[in-house]
Swiss-Prot record:
Protein name per the record: ATP-dependent helicase/nuclease subunit A
Binding of ATP, residues: 47-54
Reactions listed under catalytic activity: Couples ATP hydrolysis with the unwinding of duplex DNA by translocating in the 3'-5' direction; ATP + H2O = ADP + phosphate + H(+)
Function of the molecule: The heterodimer acts as both an ATP-dependent DNA helicase and an ATP-dependent, dual-direction single-stranded exonuclease. Recognizes the chi site generating a DNA molecule suitable for the initiation of homologous recombination. The AddA nuclease domain is required for chi fragment generation; this subunit has the helicase and 3' -> 5' nuclease activities.
Molecular function terms from GO: 3'-5' DNA helicase activity; 3'-5' exonuclease activity; ATP binding; ATP hydrolysis activity; double-stranded DNA binding
Length: 1212
């Protein structure tokens, strides 16, 4: 058939005009049309929040299909598995809809093929694709195709730690032992062990894994900064400019302060005040140094200039005028901190280079040995698989060319969250002019996963400045939020985000625009609100705001609860329409408790990390620790005090005194043994009741210890549950469902642990303890949640979602700057920067002390730290953008602080329509940004209102309460019309039942069926033997069987059947299939040896050598298709409804005028006719699917029967 050509630019422009003039209720925007139909070049779609990017992707894919591009010619990368599933589902609906609408037979056939190919199309995460690629071509690198993924962090840590420990020992005793010891001590801090150094190595390793070639980055970039930034001449030009700008801005800020009305410039006698003279001198001197920097100091004199400035200006940040503090010198002091010591730092910085070279060597060796350890386990991390895939494509031009030729277009969603590994993969798959990238740099919030928004940003600038490199399309229209939300968001980011801090300029290019007229209808009551809990009265109370401002206060939660009660009662807002957004999953217990107190239903996003801290799990872990090592007193006491044994304090005190007379340092377990045997020093304290408790404990405990030696962890845990009824016990406690789910999950996690290859109770306990030691936890187990409830989730989890009412909580929480205090900071460009601990004994001429250790920030460290700070602030801005753009109707931002103090904190300054760079760099909370913007700009252009809420506003009488629905009084039927309601309800139930009966077939019809399910539905009874007339009893007779050491395990027919199918798929077809070909394919199977031995190779060879079908397959090897998936619409005769049949065809030969279908069967049989009838329905479906797909009427069907005494080929 002939397909329509792709649209030209002129045709696209014409279509845009037609769309604008149409009477459609929801019109596509000109930019959406451009993004859907443009072809023949690289395209970057910058899609703002709520702009319909998924719609654009779906429409573009469908347009390509309707113009003759097959679904397997498209590579579509999504950020999550869920997103891939949703994309496939929507595409399936679109293709099915097109099938129904068209009457063109050829197009129907083509669309059916696309529907069939959808399930195996390359639509998914990059991880999924690289796994498939490495499975297929990993042999070029010597990688077995049956590798597994190391997804469990605990398993990764066990392997990492083993490799690190061995390598650490080698270096500590090797040729560079002295230098290595100095390196470890440089990062040791206050600790005396290697734990800090271990974390440094893991940090470098993880960072390098996000590059496209970790080893190359470690070799070429790791020491780049250390080798470059050795003296003043190496300081980047931009850093010098920024420093001089800070001097100029400080002088101007000081001038502004001296011009204030309340600033006292002259005395009563009319002479300048001393302060004014001093400040004037500072202003003149700072401006003179800026003006004559090159002649007075130059780049080499930066250190001297910094010291001269430090001498000139006061040590504090503020200038106080009329009681108000103005932070004039804050930015300058921040800049001086590193510069004024640079001369000294440069004297010692060279000493750090040999240490960094050892660090580089150790990290390279660790990376290689860790990979070797994973090779031995045949288990890899996702990053390993991605790098293998890159290596395969870079080293094998033929394989790469296969993919380049295959893909008409390489599409990627959420492009702003790509890392450099993923970007390299996209480059290798593309022909250089067929990439389609969709994303929004303002929503790049995964830097902690090594995502780099600069990949998007650089592409954005490149296409903007060089249109010949690709087309940039901007989707600005937002179809999600009302204008109140959009205006508030724009008013914040217009003054907050630029290239200096934010990485992009938030101008007309990025501002949100309402996409429909309905969104522009004003709702003044929905104006965005900033609600701040006033902490002025909370300083001396138990529930006071903690010094740690990261903790959400009770006052914040109460004001949110009050507003939700008002929304629910007065505006009839459903709880499910309200969402609370927080920065992290931890420390939200106060929210849960307060909402519970006020009866507001609340559900979380299920990502809390408190699993190991739940009481029932802690009890079980201590039980396992005790079984593993009874001499662990802490664990044993916890077990004894648990409900399983219920020893009280008095019992434990008596037992604690039962040491042997000559041994005073015995463990509790040994003392218990002494008491049980009557040998304790204070045996008279052991009462009869306590003795009985001891006997019962030892009987159970020893049985557990014995059981643990010969059985799995899973069985041991369930034995503990059953022996002491602990699982049933927690079922009687509050939140029983959650508690029982936690215990059940513990057993499953233990089982999964052993399935990964790690065995033994000791190793499992060690893994759990390591998780807790690193202050980590496992996610809570999900249980059924109420539907109509307020949702609490993290901002990260909310990305891509939308909610009617949104509360962003804890906006006063400080951004995490922990990475900026680390002794080592990494940069993709500059490599490593460290804090170096130098011995300054000679410099300070110290004679009494053996050493004088001083920690100094090397220049690479200072540059990396500044880069990291700006990147962190930019990411936090994007996080705020994501949070604000989740709301559809109304947005609340909630924080806390003293109204009196906050009022004096912001100076109301702005520059270039933005908050000053220095202020934006200094502020470390969302709240600071919002209040600083409010102080600097007029209220009518901000579109948000700030209110301070006091404790007086949150008294119980003002909080309100939820209006409960009144229940019917069963004893008072007057005027309540209850009988009418019951009658009406019964009538409705009767009507529903009639509908159920009428549409019974449709109700029970599944949307998707497999051929096997349909086969079973129609399958006749083959024989009467073995048919049970009555159901047999489930009670089994007691029996004892001797261990069958010499007997062979019974062969699983399913495993055998799957293996035969895989062998026939892998088998290389030629004009003459040989025994060697079959054995080669057999060797490639990733199955147990006993399964391989069960495959009857002689029958397969006989099939190809003697049967007409086997010879036909060999003669037409180029026309043979194997393991071909299909999907087909079928009408159910009972209900008249359509459903989808999906399956996989073993193989077929495609001729011009006919198709030969064949299927392998390994079923045991004596009568081939019975097998033929059993599979007739299934083969008919296969034939029907092929006939529809290729529009060929003749389909000859054959069964290849391998399960009998001899090979048979039967025609159906």
């Amino acid at each position: 058939m002939t397909f329509k050509p792709f649209l030209t630019d002129q045709e696209i422009a014409s279509l845009q005009i037609q769309e604008a003039q149409s009477d459609k209720k929801q019109k596509r925007t000109p930019e959406q049309i451009e993004a859907i139909y443009t072809s023949g070049t690289n395209i970057l779609v910058s899609a703002s929040a709520g702009s319909g990017k998924t719609f654009v992707m779906i429409e573009r894919i469908m347009d390509k299909i309707l113009r003759g591009v097959t679904i397997d010619q498209l590579f579509i990368s999504t950020f999550t598995v869920k997103a891939a599933g949703e994309l496939k589902e929507r595409l399936e609906k679109k293709i099915t809809e097109q099938l129904r609408l068209t009457n063109d037979t050829a197009l129907k056939q083509f669309l059916s093929e696309q529907l069939l190919g959808l399930q195996t199309a390359d639509i998914g995460t990059m991880d999924a694709f690289t796994q498939k690629l490495v499975t297929q071509y990993g042999y070029t690198l010597g990688i077995s195709p049956n590798f597994r993924i190391l997804q469990d962090k605990s398993e990764q840590d066990l392997l990492k730690n083993d490799v690190f420990d061995d390598l650490f020992t080698d270096y500590r005793t090797g040729d560079q032992a002295e230098l290595f010891t100095k390196l470890v001590r440089n990062f040791a801090g206050n600790r005396k062990d290697s734990s800090n150094f271990r974390q440094i190595i893991y940090k470098i390793y993880d960072f390098s894994q996000a590059t496209d070639n970790p080893q190359r980055w470690l070799l070429e970039n790791f020491l780049k900064g250390a080798n470059t930034y050795k003296d003043f001449s190496a300081i980047p030009e931009q850093e010098v400019k920024d420093f001089l700008n800070t001097l100029q801005e400080t002088a101007l800020a000081l001038r502004d302060v001296t011009d204030l009305e309340d600033y006292k410039q002259v005395t009563a006698k009319g002479t300048p005040t001393a302060a004014y003279q001093r400040h004037l001198k500072m202003i003149e001197q700072l401006q003179d140094w800026v003006l004559h920097f090159d002649s007075l100091y130059g780049r080499d004199g930066l250190g001297k200039l910094a010291n001269d400035i430090a001498t000139l200006i006061p040590s504090g940040n503020d200038v106080t005028v009329a009681g108000v503090k103005y932070p004039v010198f804050r930015s300058l002091h921040s800049r001086l901190r590193g510069l004024k010591h640079l001369e000294t730092i440069f004297k010692y910085q060279d000493q750090s280079l040999p240490l960094l070279q050892v660090l580089q060597s150790f990290t390279l060796d660790f990376s290689k040995q860790y990979l070797q350890a994973k090779m031995q386990e045949n288990a890899f991390e996702f990053s390993d698989i991605a790098h293998f895939a890159i290596q395969i494509l870079e080293e094998n031009d033929a394989i790469r060319q296969l993919y380049i030729d295959k893909y008409h277009e390489v599409m990627v969603d959420e492009y702003q969250d790509n890392n450099h590994t993923q970007e390299r993969m996209l480059e290798l798959l593309s022909n250089g002019r067929n990439r389609f990238m969709v994303g929004d740099i303002k929503q790049s919030i995964y830097r902690f996963r090594q995502a780099d928004p600069q990949i998007f940003n650089q592409k954005f600038k490149d296409f903007q400045e060089h249109p010949e490199h690709g087309k940039l399309i901007l989707l600005k229209e937002n179809f999600r939020s009302q204008s109140e939300v959009l205006d508030a968001t724009n008013s914040v980011f217009t003054h907050l985000m630029d290239e200096a801090v934010g990485e992009i300029l938030y101008d007309d290019t990025h501002q949100l625009v309402a996409g429909s007229s309905a969104q522009k209808i004003p709702y003044p009551q929905n104006e965005t609100q900033v609600l701040i809990y006033d902490t002025k009265d909370q300083q001396n109370q138990d529930l006071a705001v903690e010094d740690d401002s990261n903790q959400i206060s009770l006052g914040e939660v109460k004001l949110v609860a009050k507003e939700i009660i008002r929304l629910h009662n007065e505006e009839k807002v459903q709880f499910e329409d309200i969402t609370l957004l927080v920065s992290s999953r931890t420390r939200n217990d106060g929210i849960l408790q307060t909402f519970d107190d006020y009866g507001i239903p609340l559900v979380t996003d299920g990502g809390e990390q408190n699993y190991l801290k739940s009481v029932e799990v802690m009890v079980m872990l201590d039980t396992l620790r005790s079984i593993d090592n009874p001499l662990n007193d802490y664990a044993l006491v916890a077990l004894l005090r648990s409900p399983m044994f219920a020893f009280d304090e008095d019992d434990l005190a008596r037992l604690a005194l039962q040491n042997l007379p000559d041994q005073h340092k015995q463990n509790l377990y040994e003392k218990m043994e002494n008491a049980r045997n009557g040998q304790g020093q204070q045996v008279q304290l052991i009462t009869e009741a306590l003795s009985a408790k001891l006997d019962a404990f030892f009987e159970t405990f020893l049985s557990w210890r014995e059981f643990s030696l010969l059985n799995s962890l899973y069985d041991l845990i369930w034995k503990i549950y059953n022996d002491k009824f602990y699982y049933d016990y927690v079922g009687s406690l509050p939140k029983s469902e959650q508690r029982q789910a936690n215990l059940y999950a513990l057993a499953l996690r233990a089982d999964n642990f052993e399935k990964t290859g790690f065995k033994g109770l000791s190793r499992f306990i060690r893994m759990i303890d390591k998780i807790l030691e690193n202050q980590n936890d496992l996610a809570d187990v999900e249980v059924a949640l109420p539907k109509n409830a307020v949702t609490l989730m993290t901002i990260h989890k909310s990305k891509g979602l939308e909610f009617k009412y949104v509360f962003i909580l804890n906006i006063d929480k400080k951004f995490s700057i922990q990475d900026m205090t680390s002794p080592l900071i990494l940069s993709r460009q500059n490599g490593v920067g460290i804090k170096y601990i130098a011995d300054m004994k000679e410099e300070l001429e110290e004679k009494l002390l053996p050493t004088v250790k001083v920690s100094m920030d090397t220049l690479p460290y200072q540059l990396n730290k500044r880069e990291l700070r700006l990147a962190t602030l930019s990411e936090q801005m994007r996080l705020l953008y994501v949070a604000m753009t989740r709301s559809e109707k109304k947005l609340y931002l909630v924080g806390k602080g003293s109204q009196e103090k906050l009022g004096d904190q912001y100076d109301g300054k702005s520059e270039n329509n933005h908050l000053p760079v220095a202020d934006r760099e200094h502020y470390l909370t969302f709240q600071d940004w919002l209040l600083a913007i409010e102080a600097a700009y007029a209220a009518d252009e901000l579109h948000f209102k700030t209110s301070f809420i006091t404790d007086e506003d949150l008294t119980e009488d003002k909080m309100g309460s939820l209006e409960a629905e009144q229940a019917y009084d069963a004893d008072n039927l007057k005027d309540n019309r209850q009988s009418d309601d019951i009658t009406r309800a019964l009538d409705m139930l009767e009507a529903v039942e009639k509908l159920n009966q009428h549409y019974k077939a449709a109700i029970h019809l599944p949307t998707v069926r497999t051929p096997s399910q349909i086969k079973k539905f129609y399958e006749p009874v083959m024989e009467t033997e073995g048919v049970e007339v009555m159901q047999t009893s489930y009670q089994t007779k007691p029996k004892f069987e001797l261990p069958q050491f010499s007997k062979k395990a019974k062969q699983d027919p399913t495993a055998l059947g799957s293996s035969v199918h895989e062998l026939m798929q892998r088998l290389h077809l030629s004009e003459q299939v040989s025994l060697e070909d079959i054995l080669t394919a057999l060797a490639e199977l990733s199955v147990e040896e006993n399964v391989k031995k069960a495959i009857q190779v002689d029958k397969i060879l006989h099939f190809f050598q003697t049967s007409q079908l086997g010879k036909l397959i060999q003669a037409n090897a180029d026309k043979v298709y194997r393991e071909a998936p299909f999907a087909m619409l079928q009408a159910d005769p009972a209900s008249g409804e359509d459903y989808v049949v999906r399956g996989i065809i073993d193989g077929y030969i495609l001729f011009d005028n006919r198709i030969v279908l064949f299927d392998y069967k390994t079923d045991k049989f004596t009568n081939s006719q019975a097998i033929k009838e059993r599979y007739r329905g299934q083969m008919t479906l296969y034939a029907q699917a092929l006939s529809q797909s290729y529009n060929i009427q003749q389909v000859d069907s054959y069964l290849i029967l391998l399960g009998g005494e001899k090979l048979e080929v039967v025609e159906i």
